[in-house]
Amino acid sequence: MYVTFNEALDSSFGNLESPNHDFKVGDPNMVPTPPMDSDSAAISLAFLISLSITFAILMLILVVIAAYVTFCGDDESEYDEENALGTRTSGTLHSLFGKKHSGILLDSSFASPGGFDDEIVLQERELEELPKMSAYEVELYIRAKEFQMMSPPMVKDFGTYLDSDDQQFIKDRGIQSYFLLPSINDNIDEYGNFLPSFIVQDKLDIQFSKFNKSSSTVMNYPLPHNRKDAVYFEVKIFRHIQKSNSIFSIGLTTVPYPYFRVPGMAKYSIAYESTGKLRINNPFTASTLLPKLEEGDTVGFGYRYKTGTIFITHNGKKLMDVTQNIGIDLFIGIGAFNAAYTRTYTRDGLLEDPDNVSFREALSEGKDIEVAKDLQRVHDPHDDSDEMTSDEVELHVNLGQVGFVFIEANVKKYAFGSVYGQIGIPPAYNGTEIKKDTILQKGEELPPRYADTDNFFGSMKVKEGSSSRITAQTSKPLWSVGTYERISSNFDRENNVYHDSLETDDNNTDNNVNNNDENAGCNENSPLLEDDGNKRPENSNTPREVSDGAINKNPRNKSTKKRQRNRGKSSKKKNRSRK
């Protein structure tokens, strides 16, 4: 039982004043017990009230910050999405290519929703940039806008594009299941022949032809989830001459993507251009942030699953992390176009490009500017007399079927999957497995005995039917090759007559017999005519008598000869009797 300090003090003084108690001095080391507050409920209530007030103030501060970021983010519009050295750091570049809470990918026309009207800004940008383009560039820009209005891009969460059948096929076949889609553009000549803009070889090797004006292709399947930290692919520049009039782009896109537009120039696409420009949904002027690509270079793109980051490599060295918070299915995209049909990449456009400092310095100093011959002026692709052939470009895509130039991708296994999938490699047909088979080896030691016949299929005979007059006899002599070719055609047998063939018509035979009767006297004096008219060569036969390389003697010919001979003898006897 605890008592208060005042009660203890009154009790001690009372003991001193009482005569019935002796005075006792207490222990000097003894410390009096401090008083305790018995009202603990009041203290707990005050503590809870103060804690609630603190949390309320914190929540109010967070709400104010969220409202400010949401409705007062106009400063994002001042940032150039292509220039990482602008007013903001390169780490915030992902806000231009990020996605909303609903999973929709934002394009480069706006940075934060609700900040301003993106359509008005886009119209202002078009009024500024379109006059700087050629007629062909404006045509492609309008076609791309109409294409994506009619066929909106499929912006889906990562891993939701494929169905169960496609996923099983990829597991079975591995990298062998991936391929680039073929050319589907509308280039034809005056005769209607298809002129492909590019040719896909061995599924992953693409070659842009001389007929290419502006085209692109995508992979048949999106980036896979290989159960690693990231997925990665590389593109080897196998052929690209210096001062080429062809410009190509390598990157990632959504589908469907305009087949006549290179990656990076339409919505929901990012690309590394061969000129060194980095394009993110930008068909207008872009800044040069990357090295220019030459023949023999290797460009790589990687995607990290956890952070949604896209990074770019060049010749095995990582250059930069381009975007973050990407959570949609993306496809590999490759495209190329003829720069001679554009104003952006011809002489006038190159001089206006702020990144071409050397051109402006040379122009100010009065020096000659080295520009390719095809890029001196803008050409018209719709004019046959002004049409230019494109320089060929050949690119090879590596999904992991061979080693990467980027060492980290090899060590951490960033490939698209196994080369041959769960089915494995196909069997070898070079004979090494056959040599190990005991039964097949025994069969080689004891070859089968084939029948000794006239030909490979043995002795073949054709049975003679009721309406057939042909009997195959392989033992008889064959016709010559030339004669056999002439009589082997139905048309020749019915319409053409050769000097070494005989007429088999009965009417012709009767006519010959009548002529012999009328000219019997003449035949006696001219035996040559008699032989020619009455006797046939022994080795000559009609086409009807030849079949399957065999020669048949028609019994009708024998009877005809006998009648001719008998009539000849009778005519001779009559002449003698008259004499």
Swiss-Prot record:
Lumenal side stretches: 66-579
Transmembrane annotation, as ranges: 45-65
InterPro entries tied to this protein: B30.2/SPRY, B30.2/SPRY_sf, ConA-like_dom_sf, SPRY_dom, Ubq-SigPath_Reg
Residues in cross-link Glycyl lysine isopeptide (Lys-Gly) (interchain with G-Cter in ubiquitin): K367
GO biological process, one term: protein transport
Family statement: Belongs to the SSH4 family.
Organismal lineage: Eukaryota, Fungi, Dikarya, Ascomycota, Saccharomycotina
Role of this protein: Components of the endosome-vacuole trafficking pathway that regulates nutrient transport. May be involved in processes which determine whether plasma membrane proteins are degraded or routed to the plasma membrane. Confers leflunomide resistance when overexpressed.
Topology feature Cytoplasmic, residues: 1-44
Entry keyword set: Endosome, Glycoprotein, Isopeptide bond, Membrane, Phosphoprotein, Protein transport, Signal-anchor, Transmembrane, Transmembrane helix, Transport, Ubl conjugation, Vacuole
Residue ranges of every copy of the B30.2/SPRY domain listed in the record: 166-364
Residue stretches of biased makeup (Low complexity): 509-525
GO CC terms, sorted: endosome membrane; vacuolar membrane
Annotated glycosylation sites: N212, N356, N430, N507, N557, N575
Residue ranges of the region described as Disordered: 499-579
Protein name per UniProt: Protein SSH4
